[in-house]
């Protein structure tokens, strides 16, 4: 199991869409289903707690998710759509 933390909704921020809508904020929080399904490179606000350095002593916790690595691809994580059935939420 891997512990990751971040926002409760994965925000897909494809570089192409980010540059296209740079000055327009109307589509900034929309996840594009086509982008996620095609496996395009995206970025999410998640940190793997197993990879944190010891120097990062202060961590601000949001919801934590336990993800079964055998069933999920951590690089294309889309919590709302793809991994609803494999996630257990832990709140502090």
UniProtKB/Swiss-Prot annotation:
Q: Does the keyword Repeat apply?
A: yes
In residue numbers, the region (Disordered) covers 19-38
Quote the InterPro entries the UniProt record gives: Orthopox_F7
Q: What is a single Pfam family found in this protein's UniProt entry?
A: Orthopox_F7
Which keywords are on file for this protein?
A: Early protein, Repeat
Membrane-spanning intervals of the chain: none
Tell me if Transcription regulation is a UniProt keyword of this record. Answer: no
> What drives induction of this protein's expression?
Expressed in the early phase of the viral replicative cycle.
Q: Where is this region: 8 X 2 AA tandem repeats of K-N?
A: 16-31
- Where does each sequence repeat begin and end? 16-17, 18-19, 20-21, 22-23, 24-25, 26-27, 28-29, 30-31
Feature: compositional bias, Basic residues: 19-31
Q: Which family does it belong to?
A: Belongs to the orthopoxvirus OPG051 family.
Q: What is this protein called?
A: Protein OPG051
């Amino acid at each position: 199991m891997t512990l990751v933390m971040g926002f409760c909704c994965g925000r897909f921020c494809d570089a192409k869409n980010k540059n296209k809508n740079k000055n327009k904020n109307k589509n900034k929080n929309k996840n594009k289903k086509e982008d996620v399904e095609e496996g395009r490179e995206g970025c999410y606000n998640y940190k793997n707690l197993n990879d944190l350095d010891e120097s990062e002593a202060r961590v601000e916790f949001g919801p934590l998710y336990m993800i079964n690595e055998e069933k999920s691809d951590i690089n294309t994580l889309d919590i709302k759509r793809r991994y609803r059935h494999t996630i257990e939420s832990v709140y502090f």
